[in-house]
Amino acid sequence: MISFFVIFELKKMKGVIHHIEIYVSDLENTIEFWSWLLKELGYVISQQFDGGISYKLNDSYIVFVQTEKEFLNDGYHRKRTGLNHLAFHVNTKVEVDWFTEELKKKNVNILYEDKHPHAGGKDYCAVFFEDPDRIKVELVASEN
């Protein structure tokens, strides 16, 4: 018999993303880009396997897998059908500013710089940028 507490915990998990798997054009560049960022967001490396890596935070994880050669030619573009961007919470505008400076030091392409940090609107504080495959990434402050 399942206890009330087990059922309660299961219901809290309902709807939470279990994992996201992203195919990438160059796994080595992807690892270099994402490792520091995800570490700063609290993720840890969960698995490393031939052709891929996963990072875990609590009960969710993100997997990056090397795209097979035969599928590399088409490339990715966020305006095509499919994923547009990934957005992650940070706590405050101070963190958005810190990440922005770190990204610039790494020569990462910051999007919408003319509207930064309010590209999402006057009451919305975030930094938008691209990973090595030009997947748009957003870090949004929970508090402004």
Residue ranges and their predicted role:
Residues E21-E68:
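Core segments of cupin and vicinal oxygen chelate
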Residues Q66-E70, A141-N144:
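Acetyl-CoA-dependent GNAT
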Residues I17-S25, Y76-N144:
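Vicinal oxygen chelate
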Residues F8-I31, L86, E143:
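N-terminal beta-strand motif that seeds the catalytic metal site of vicinal oxygen chelate
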Residues I31-E32, D97, V137:
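Alpha-helical elements of the RecA-like P-loop NTPase motor core of helicases
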Residues M1-I7:
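Hydrophobic alpha-helical signal peptides and transmembrane signal-/tail-anchor segments
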Residues E70-Y76:
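Short beta-strand/turn micro-motifs at beta-sheet edges
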